[in-house]
Amino acid sequence: MAGDEAGVTLGQPHLSRQDLATLDVTKLTPLSPEVISRQATINIGTIGHVAHGKSTVVKAISGVHTVRFKNELERNITIKLGYANAKIYKLDDPSCSRPECYRSCGSSTPDEFPTDIPGTKGNFKLVRHVSFVDCPGHDILMATMLNGAAVMDAALLLIAGNESCPQPQTSEHLAAIEIMKLKHILILQNKIDLVKESQAKEQYEQILAFVQGTVAEGAPIIPISAQLKYSIEVVCEYIVKKIPVPLRDFTSEPRLIVIRSFDVNKPGCEVDDLKGGVAGGSILKGVLKVGQEIEVRPGIVSKDSEGKLMCKPIFSKIVSLFAEHNDLQYAAPGGLIGVGTKIDPTLCRADRMVGQVLGAVGALPEIFTELEISYFLLRRLLGVRTEGDKKAAKVQKLSKNEVLMVNIGSLSTGGRVSAVKADLGKIVLTNPVCTEVGEKIALSRRVEKHWRLIGWGQIRRGVTIKPTVDDD
């Protein structure tokens, strides 16, 4: 990549130019044209029960099929988190009625294009660039869903019109986004083409009753058919009007949570042609730039001769940044960003870096091995009905020495409860985690061979370890 000359023209010349030489981070906003031309600045999760059409809705809006892996295609379910970016446009002709004046396209579409609606004039102009985090709806994949929730700004809750509401995962996901303090939710009543009008009305009442008293109370309910792309522009309009652009911090030291990582080299590649590992994630704050020196924590985890955990942070350099197929010179908080580094690709392959935190050297938070948390348990297990009883099983109190699954940011790790008192608990983590006091964590327990969400906590303090650094 030629990056030396000023105002370097990146790939995709039809998109806005980015120039590191003239970059002033204090002037950037989540709607700056040079930012949203190339990358998404809002993350929207799709949540809901398995087979209610989450991936189909994302495909209808963005044109990207989020089911990428062979075993996912065969079983037609999402297993890993799927991602897709979409640009939302609005026609600048005031005579065009809504919702027809809204349109969504893929992320490489130019920022402006002429109208093709008969009887209208003017151009479709880019108003939002959104990243969809397509979460699995399967109960066994709840951990993946929670990892996705760590980066969401808003959620589309999908409910299939041809099934009764709520289905088990629908309530579990709703509780999860409540924990993550997501306030902006759109409810999509999908598969409306499969039911009679009376049935749709009846289910609408069910949905209203179901969301009463939850974060989704008062959320708009939009009847759609994702398969037939019916009412998709209505969804686009609601995304623009109902989901506020999140306030972002562009000036702090950058920090990115890794939610995917891969080795992009093909087998049999010449040594000289090897590329460094790629980390995919969402920037929480700050701006990453091509050429910047970075640190990844906790890095490489090992044990010393006494069995104590040790962490060696990875130091590297950013060689490329991209959002889907768009090259970037700098990346802002928001949608999913791919960071090409000089890290040994074997450390990144097959999502090995998930749960790590990448950022400016020396500016990342501490690495914890034990956490002291104040926690809150759900009263009943979501989605699990006990045999012969219509009510869900009660959540038992935390007991000493039990092993829970803890979700911190995008990391899922085991944690042994070492002490518990009233609403305080101490948890010894299986894997060290780079996090801060005050962060929220989700707790899951193994019930009938599945991990089920049982509550959440907030980090009060913990035991940190000093990272080891090579003395070269």
Swiss-Prot record:
<dbReference type="Pfam" id="PF03144">
    <property type="entry name" value="GTP_EFTU_D2"/>
</dbReference>
<feature type="region of interest" description="G2">
    <location>
        <begin position="76"/>
        <end position="80"/>
    </location>
</feature>
<dbReference type="Pfam" id="PF09173">
    <property type="entry name" value="eIF2_C"/>
</dbReference>
<dbReference type="GO" id="GO:0005525">
    <property type="term" value="F:GTP binding"/>
</dbReference>
<dbReference type="GO" id="GO:0003743">
    <property type="term" value="F:translation initiation factor activity"/>
</dbReference>
<dbReference type="InterPro" id="IPR044128">
    <property type="entry name" value="eIF2g_GTP-bd"/>
</dbReference>
<dbReference type="GO" id="GO:0001731">
    <property type="term" value="P:formation of translation preinitiation complex"/>
</dbReference>
<comment type="function">
    <text>Member of the eIF2 complex that functions in the early steps of protein synthesis by forming a ternary complex with GTP and initiator tRNA. This complex binds to a 40S ribosomal subunit, followed by mRNA binding to form the 43S pre-initiation complex (43S PIC). Junction of the 60S ribosomal subunit to form the 80S initiation complex is preceded by hydrolysis of the GTP bound to eIF2 and release of an eIF2-GDP binary complex. In order for eIF2 to recycle and catalyze another round of initiation, the GDP bound to eIF2 must exchange with GTP by way of a reaction catalyzed by eIF-2B.</text>
</comment>
<comment type="subunit">
    <text>Eukaryotic translation initiation factor 2 eIF2 is a heterotrimeric complex composed of an alpha (EIF2S1), a beta (EIF2S2) and a gamma (EIF2S3) chain. eIF2 is member of the 43S pre-initiation complex (43S PIC).</text>
</comment>
<dbReference type="InterPro" id="IPR004161">
    <property type="entry name" value="EFTu-like_2"/>
</dbReference>
<feature type="region of interest" description="G5">
    <location>
        <begin position="225"/>
        <end position="227"/>
    </location>
</feature>
<dbReference type="GO" id="GO:0003924">
    <property type="term" value="F:GTPase activity"/>
</dbReference>
<keyword id="KW-0396">Initiation factor</keyword>
<dbReference type="GO" id="GO:0005850">
    <property type="term" value="C:eukaryotic translation initiation factor 2 complex"/>
</dbReference>
<feature type="region of interest" description="G1">
    <location>
        <begin position="48"/>
        <end position="55"/>
    </location>
</feature>
<feature type="region of interest" description="G4">
    <location>
        <begin position="190"/>
        <end position="193"/>
    </location>
</feature>
<feature type="modified residue" description="N-acetylalanine; partial">
    <location>
        <position position="2"/>
    </location>
</feature>
<keyword id="KW-0378">Hydrolase</keyword>
<dbReference type="InterPro" id="IPR015256">
    <property type="entry name" value="eIF2g_C"/>
</dbReference>
<dbReference type="InterPro" id="IPR000795">
    <property type="entry name" value="T_Tr_GTP-bd_dom"/>
</dbReference>
<dbReference type="GO" id="GO:1990856">
    <property type="term" value="F:methionyl-initiator methionine tRNA binding"/>
</dbReference>
<feature type="binding site">
    <location>
        <begin position="225"/>
        <end position="227"/>
    </location>
    <ligand>
        <name>GTP</name>
    </ligand>
</feature>
<feature type="binding site">
    <location>
        <begin position="51"/>
        <end position="56"/>
    </location>
    <ligand>
        <name>GTP</name>
    </ligand>
</feature>
<dbReference type="GO" id="GO:0002183">
    <property type="term" value="P:cytoplasmic translational initiation"/>
</dbReference>
<dbReference type="GO" id="GO:0005829">
    <property type="term" value="C:cytosol"/>
</dbReference>
<dbReference type="InterPro" id="IPR009000">
    <property type="entry name" value="Transl_B-barrel_sf"/>
</dbReference>
<keyword id="KW-0547">Nucleotide-binding</keyword>
<feature type="region of interest" description="Interacts with CDC123">
    <location>
        <begin position="457"/>
        <end position="469"/>
    </location>
</feature>
<keyword id="KW-0007">Acetylation</keyword>
<keyword id="KW-0342">GTP-binding</keyword>
<feature type="binding site">
    <location>
        <begin position="190"/>
        <end position="193"/>
    </location>
    <ligand>
        <name>GTP</name>
    </ligand>
</feature>
<protein>
    <recommendedName>
        <fullName>Eukaryotic translation initiation factor 2 subunit 3</fullName>
        <ecNumber>3.6.5.3</ecNumber>
    </recommendedName>
</protein>
<dbReference type="InterPro" id="IPR027417">
    <property type="entry name" value="P-loop_NTPase"/>
</dbReference>
<comment type="similarity">
    <text>Belongs to the TRAFAC class translation factor GTPase superfamily. Classic translation factor GTPase family. EIF2G subfamily.</text>
</comment>
<keyword id="KW-0648">Protein biosynthesis</keyword>
<feature type="domain" description="tr-type G">
    <location>
        <begin position="39"/>
        <end position="247"/>
    </location>
</feature>
<keyword id="KW-0963">Cytoplasm</keyword>
<feature type="region of interest" description="G3">
    <location>
        <begin position="134"/>
        <end position="137"/>
    </location>
</feature>
<dbReference type="InterPro" id="IPR044127">
    <property type="entry name" value="eIF2g_dom_2"/>
</dbReference>
<dbReference type="Pfam" id="PF00009">
    <property type="entry name" value="GTP_EFTU"/>
</dbReference>
<dbReference type="InterPro" id="IPR050543">
    <property type="entry name" value="eIF2G"/>
</dbReference>
<dbReference type="InterPro" id="IPR009001">
    <property type="entry name" value="Transl_elong_EF1A/Init_IF2_C"/>
</dbReference>
